[in-house]
From Swiss-Prot:
GO terms for cellular component: cytosol. To M.jannaschii MJ0989. It comes from the Archaea. This is Uncharacterized protein MK0008. InterPro entries: DsrEFH-like, Sulphur_relay_DsrE/F-like.
Length: 121
């Protein structure tokens, strides 16, 4: 898989929108923890999860999920958002923060094949 011995590749698939429930928050906390522990993490945003990568989030009285996603990217996570899912929700590449790339199901399939573990939120 191309990673040093002892390092797992973990793909985290997030389908939940931010702020409606805590699944997306839990997914990002999981991903950040895995990164801090030295694992290789790939985050795929799908369905309403694509809103996690949208610029300009500034929620009141709850943790800012976008800041967590940015921390994951800073720690080395590769992040992709489903292009068709984004388009269906009125989002284009310009709507996403730096470090989030639009992708396809082919990209997700390749990540799953390359991963030691896949977790779906």
């Amino acid at each position: 898989m191309g990673t040093p011995e002892g390092i797992d590749v973990i793909t985290v698939v997030i389908s939940e929108a931010p702020y409606g429930q805590e699944r997306a928050y839990t997914a990002l906390r999981f991903a950040l923890t895995a990164l801090v522990e030295g694992e290789e993490v790939k985050i795929f945003l799908i369905e309403d999860g694509v809103f996690l990568g949208k610029k300009g989030q500034n929620p009141d009285e709850v943790p800012n999920y976008l800041e967590l996603l940015e921390q994951c990217i800073e720690q080395g996570a590769e992040v992709k958002a489903c292009g068709p899912c984004s388009k269906a929700r009125g989002l284009s590449e310009e709507d996403f923060i730096e470090g989030v790339e639009l992708a396809t199901m082919h990209d997700l399939v390749n990540w799953v094949k390359e991963s030691d573990n896949v977790i779906f939120f």
